[in-house]
């Protein structure tokens, strides 16, 4: 069975909360990377978005890159992610099937209006965590840090997203090569 990390929302009341989709996704990826085992260092456990944010940018807010997230998580939790840009969809799919999780960059306008929409009215760049792929229908278990059920019409993550939706959202991310995904992968934990 694939290890499933604790869901982390980005709107947690901490500094930069509503800009912490990347740190929240990385927190979940770091917990998966270590399969829930505390590295027994002087940093908190389990991983939290605010701690990753403070390691990356202690005095400012804003978007984060996959490299920044990796550097913060490596410092805090000794989780060295495999950061890749322009990963062909078939390669992404095979890496998830093989037992890796991934922080994935998406364009949220693709998700808008679906039952997976965690922030109606938000259309920008976003970070999510993908934990696994279901064999029966090819859906992906997505931990969207916006899906925290803060209102009755906001879903609670994680959710099983259809592969077509995940692919469209990832391929629509500005700067992504056609047919490709920008992602940061955990080690194979299976």
Report residues per predicted region.
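Active-site-adjacent structural segments surrounding the nucleophilic cysteine of cysteine proteases
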Residues: 1-63, 118, 135-137, 189
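Extracytoplasmic/secreted proteins, especially bacterial periplasmic and envelope-associated proteins
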Residues: 20, 24-28, 64, 68-72, ...
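Structured segments of extracytoplasmic/periplasmic soluble domains
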Residues: 24-36, 72-79, 95-98
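Short regulatory "switch" loops immediately downstream of catalytic or recognition motifs
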Residues: 31-38, 107-114, 147-148, 169-170
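Mid-length scaffold segments of soluble, non-membrane domains
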Residues: 62-86
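Active-site-adjacent substructure of cysteine-protease-like catalytic cores
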Residues: 87-143, 151
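Noncatalytic regulatory segments and standalone regulatory/sensor domains
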Residues: 121-122, 133-190
């Amino acid at each position: 069975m694939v290890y499933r990390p604790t869901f982390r929302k980005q709107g947690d009341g901490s500094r930069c909360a509503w800009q912490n989709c990347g740190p929240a996704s990385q927190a979940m990826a770091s917990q998966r990377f270590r399969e829930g085992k505390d590295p027994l260092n002087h940093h908190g456990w389990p991983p939290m978005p605010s701690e990753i944010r403070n390691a990356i940018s202690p005095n400012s807010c804003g978007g984060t890159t996959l490299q920044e997230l990796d550097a913060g998580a490596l410092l805090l939790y000794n989780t060295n992610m495999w950061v890749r840009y322009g990963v062909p969809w078939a390669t992404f799919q095979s890496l998830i099937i093989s037992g890796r999780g991934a922080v994935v960059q998406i364009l949220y306008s693709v998700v808008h209006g679906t039952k997976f929409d965690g922030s109606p009215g938000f259309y920008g760049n976003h970070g999510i965590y993908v934990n696994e792929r279901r064999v029966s229908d090819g859906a992906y278990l997505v931990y969207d840090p916006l899906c925290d059920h803060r209102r009755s019409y906001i879903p609670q993550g994680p959710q099983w997203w259809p592969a077509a939706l995940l692919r469209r959202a990832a391929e629509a991310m500005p700067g992504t090569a056609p047919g490709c995904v920008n992602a940061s992968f955990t080690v194979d934990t299976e």
